[in-house]
Amino acid sequence: MDSENKDQKDICNKFGASFVESPSYLKIGISRNVSEGAWPINGLRHPMEGDTTGWYIWAGEELSDDPDFFVPLHVEHLKAWRPEIIKYLGLAPGWRFLVGEDNYEDVGRI
């Protein structure tokens, strides 16, 4: 098992969530400000569909209603954007996370 899957399974076990893999070749929807170092980082997983994992990830306090707010990004490229959130991508659809500076972490079902 690679270390990313192990970390993801550890997060799922910690919070009592089922593990649902987010393969590196599938896409997430992500806001551009995530790559700019903005905090906090929010993630919300919908059911997987087509070539997507179901994940929508954004940074900041507010979710924009701009139709171009989310851009598609392959999971494998998240390593270059914000590798510290990869460990949450094994959470099942219906789960969300919020992480902030200084290791703040809030994970739960929606």
Region roles according to the model:
Residues 63-69, 100:
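Charge-biased low-complexity segments
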Residues 8-12, 25, 67, 71, ...:
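Generic, low-specificity signal for short hydrophobic/alpha-helical stretches with a mild N-terminal bias
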Residues 15-64, 74-75:
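Short helix/strand-capping turn motifs
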Residues 72-110:
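Short, compact, well-ordered microdomains
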Residues 1-20:
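Charged, alpha-helical interface segments at or near domain boundaries
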